[in-house]
């Protein structure tokens, strides 16, 4: 048998079983019909899209220092002449411990809107917070320019973490085990909001929401947790703020 016949025979033998399988599979498979009802797609807002938009994190924190870039971005994203976005999610930063320098992205290091705070003598409660909205001036500049470009813009606030002094690890990047020598072993599967400070965190959100409203930005809805049931958010992460919550722990 010459070389060409050998190759032809091998190919024919190799293809026969597969051809049979394909044929049998096609004959045995019955069509499945799926009928979609768009009206029942979502129980929220009667199944209708409320709008379309973008989160301000963290490009607003990066661009907001420049009036030129701020206005250009607001027009491009939110005006009728641009994309016409009508929803904006505003990231209320927890604000990490000022002695920490592990978040190495300049845009994701979102400052908290406060300049000082005071804890109770046992450290279990927040007695007072001195608020300062100018700490988040860059993002605020973008939000105001966006509202000017689209007066009907819907703002939703959201938190990635509570302020560092409300967390178990003293870090807004996430959870971990606090060792006897004060060091922390990172563990993104551990809840990081201090058990005694759920009410304090809720008050922080309420106070900050009023602070923004008094400065022209009204949050019409608020998401207090962002992707909470993951193991992403560990102590000392270089990426961003984050806080794990077990289901039912919030």
Could you describe each region identified by the protein language model?
Residues 230-250:
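Aromatic- and carboxylate-enriched substrate-binding clefts and catalytic-loop regions
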Residues 29-220, 224, 241, 245:
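N-terminal catalytic cores of secreted or lumenal carbohydrate-active enzymes
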Residues 17-30:
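Sec-dependent signal peptide cleavage junction
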Residues 1-3:
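N-terminal secretory signal peptides that target proteins for export/translocation
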Residues 24, 98-100, 232-235:
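Short acidic, Gly/Pro-enriched loop/turn segments at secondary-structure junctions
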Residues 5-14:
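Sec-dependent N-terminal signal peptides
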Residues 224-230:
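Acidic helix/loop microenvironments that form the catalytic cleft of cell-wall polysaccharide enzymes
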Residues 20, 160-162, 229:
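Short, glycine/serine-rich, charged loops/turns that create anion-binding
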